[in-house]
């Protein structure tokens, strides 16, 4: 491309002298870099014909208000901008949106430089661990360096190229710094390639220098032509498929570990067909839960540390484990002590080679749906030995008693009884969600998900503070669903400000706050490793005055409809009224911090101190060493 002579400087200095391959350069349009970015976002479609970027969350500051703020205002009718109260939780809402949409759509989040940007680092890590797409657009310092150091700029004495946004590098799947307007011509396609590639999916960070946002450039018009990003469905390698088929055919007691990739691939129907044809039972991870309905005969339920006895018993005896779309984190594998059959083989079907080859597994790199279909064809005639029908009957005979409504009495309700009350109030369109604290374990064990997409758990990063913002994101993704968020008082105190955002926007969902007056889950873990109760429950923290937080009043002050209940019966009555409420509906109930579901579960490696003056710790250390030895000799 050539510039008009009247506008051209010394040709060797022309920033547009480089012609990019694959981009038609005949016609151009002059835009600021920020305008070019938002125009490009609006032209990127998914294979269903919807804009891949559904909207932009924004908190403006000096690092993005003049450039991106002006550009977003210009497209506000086609690319909506949403205002939140905290950069981290805005990003949580965006990530939850994408997770509930099974990665077919995503959102962007923009902040100013400095603290606004670093607030999003936790959310980037959450998306990175969970393999979820989000486009992060933190403002950055001046590319010209003329006004250095600008307000909120980090100065590295030994590296002049560093800014606060370098914090995003280890928690981004793709990171770029836009310090020239033309950088967008390569950075944006790379960003969308990352967000739409099942094997490489995750957060993208484009650190956008604030002066460059406002700088104009003659962009090729062809750059803004609509583009459809198709979901790549990797087919299995013939050799890997043959080896996996041979291993499965040799197995008599195989089990499938269904992970989140089953949902993201849209493979739930393929999974059901596969297990029914070959009589292979499944165990569900937190991300994979609801891949099959809870009452399907071959769904053994939750696996691992927060798992149930049916799945864990079968996994311990299995002679082959077929992981499908799972990261095999320690809560799933019992710190690799669960799959204890010494003759056990492992096959991992995953789009990412990194996950497919973990712990010496036999890799089957493939899209989950396609991989299951091709495995099914190759396994014609194969059926595994039957699994005892009594396993699930016995399990639910135990745990259903824990979720029953209590009789009359003054005892505080348990978290299990709260789960039971919500279960009785739920229906087929209900989505329950959570992330951290006590409830992820109880929900994994106890919740009966009736169909795919009815269970939304962020348990990769297990980030306290995801819940309220995440519930809002889920409801924005699927407005017709009945969204119920479980959160403890500890998580609520960490991040609750998007309650006001939801109230302002009229986004309706239900929040059940179980108030056990502290970090009850970690208090139990502390006791379980021999530690004294210390600094977890509020009564065990340094204080002069007892804590007495009125969560219902606090939620109401942010615009929510709220109620405090004192019993399971009152909780059920309150939940029955949730359909009458517009905006967030908060129900608070006090619970006992000590009980949890003792049935099921498996060993989890939490290092216990080798030296302690407490006999309780020494006793737990001895048990820990025995467990380590058993795990390492299996």
Language-model segments: residues:
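N-terminal alpha/beta PP-like core and its mobile active-site loop of ThDP/TPP-dependent enzymes
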Residues: 26-383, 425-428, 508-511, 531, ...
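Thiamine diphosphate
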Residues: 145-158, 356-357, 365, 372-373, ...
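Active-site diphosphate/adenylate-binding microenvironment
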Residues: 56-68, 72, 395-469, 474
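Phosphate/pyrophosphate-binding active-site segments
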Residues: 179-182, 220, 343, 347-436, ...
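A glycine-rich phosphate-binding loop feature that marks nucleotide/adenosyl-phosphate handling sites
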Residues: 207-212, 437-440, 592
């Amino acid at each position: 491309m050539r510039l008009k002579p009247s506008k051209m400087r010394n040709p060797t200095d022309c920033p547009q002298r480089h012609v990019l391959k694959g981009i038609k350069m005949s016609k151009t349009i002059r835009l600021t870099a920020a305008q070019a970015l938002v125009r490009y976002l609006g032209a990127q479609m998914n294979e269903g014909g919807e804009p891949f970027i559904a909207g932009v969350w924004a908190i403006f500051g000096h690092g993005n208000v003049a450039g991106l703020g002006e550009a977003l205002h210009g497209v506000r009718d086609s690319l909506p901008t949403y205002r939140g109260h905290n950069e981290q939780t805005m990003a949580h809402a965006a990530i939850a949106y994408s997770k509930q949409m099974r990665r077919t759509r995503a959102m962007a989040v923009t902040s100013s430089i400095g603290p606004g940007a670093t607030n999003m680092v936790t959310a980037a890590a959450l998306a990175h661990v969970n393999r979820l797409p989000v486009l992060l657009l933190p403002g950055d310092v001046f590319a010209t360096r003329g006004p250095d150091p600008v307000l909120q700029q980090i100065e590295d004495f030994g590296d002049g190229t560093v800014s606060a946004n370098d914090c995003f590098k280890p928690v981004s799947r793709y990171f770029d710094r836009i310090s020239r307007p033309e950088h967008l011509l390569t950075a944006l396609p790379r960003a969308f390639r990352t967000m739409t590639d099942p094997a490489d999916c995750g957060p993208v960070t484009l650190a956008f220098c604030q002066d460059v946002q406002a700088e104009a450039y003659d962009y090729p018009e062809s750059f803004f032509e609509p583009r459809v990003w198709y979901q790549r469905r990797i087919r299995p390698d013939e050799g890997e498929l043959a080896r996996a088929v041979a291993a499965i055919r040799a197995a008599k007691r195989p089990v499938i570990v269904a992970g989140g990739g089953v949902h993201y691939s849209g493979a739930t129907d393929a999974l059901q067909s596969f297990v029914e044809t070959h009589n292979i039972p499944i165990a569900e991870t937190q991300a994979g839960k609801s891949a099959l309905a809870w009452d399907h005969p071959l769904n053994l339920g939750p696996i691992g540390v927060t798992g149930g006895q049916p799945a864990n018993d079968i996994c311990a005896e299995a002679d082959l484990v077929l992981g499908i779309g799972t990261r095999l984190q320690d809560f799933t594998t019992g710190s690799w002590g669960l799959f204890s059959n010494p003759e056990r083989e492992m096959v991992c079907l995953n789009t990412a080679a990194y996950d497919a080859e973990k712990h010496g597994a036999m890799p089957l790199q493939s899209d989950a749906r396609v991989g299951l279909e091709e495995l099914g064809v190759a396994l014609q005639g194969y059926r595994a030995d039957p699994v005892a029908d009594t396993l699930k009957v016995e399990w639910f005979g135990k745990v259903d008693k824990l979720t029953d409504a209590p009789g009359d009495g003054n005892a505080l309700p348990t978290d299990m009884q709260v789960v039971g009350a919500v279960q009785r109030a739920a229906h087929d369109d209900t989505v329950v969600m959570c992330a951290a604290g006590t409830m992820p374990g109880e929900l994994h064990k106890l919740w009966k998900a009736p169909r795919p997409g009815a269970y939304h758990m962020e348990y990769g990063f297990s980030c306290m503070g995801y819940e309220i913002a995440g519930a809002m994101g889920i409801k924005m993704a699927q407005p017709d669903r009945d969204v119920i968020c479980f959160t403890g008082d500890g998580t609520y105190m960490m991040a609750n400000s998007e309650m006001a955002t939801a109230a302002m926007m009229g986004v309706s969902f239900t929040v059940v706050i179980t108030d056990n007056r502290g970090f009850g889950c970690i208090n139990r873990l502390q006791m379980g490793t021999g530690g004294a109760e210390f600094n977890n429950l509020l009564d065990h923290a340094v204080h002069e005055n007892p804590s007495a937080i009125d969560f219902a009043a606090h939620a109401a002050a942010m615009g929510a409809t709220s109620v405090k209940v004192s019993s399971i019966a009152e909780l059920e009555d309150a939940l029955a009224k949730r359909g009458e409420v517009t905006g967030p509906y908060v129900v608070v109930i006090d619970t006992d911090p000590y009980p949890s579901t003792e049935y099921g579960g498996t060993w989890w490696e939490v290092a216990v101190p080798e030296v302690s003056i407490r006999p309780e710790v020494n006793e737990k250390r001895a048990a820990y060493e025995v467990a380590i030895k058993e795990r390492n000799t299996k």
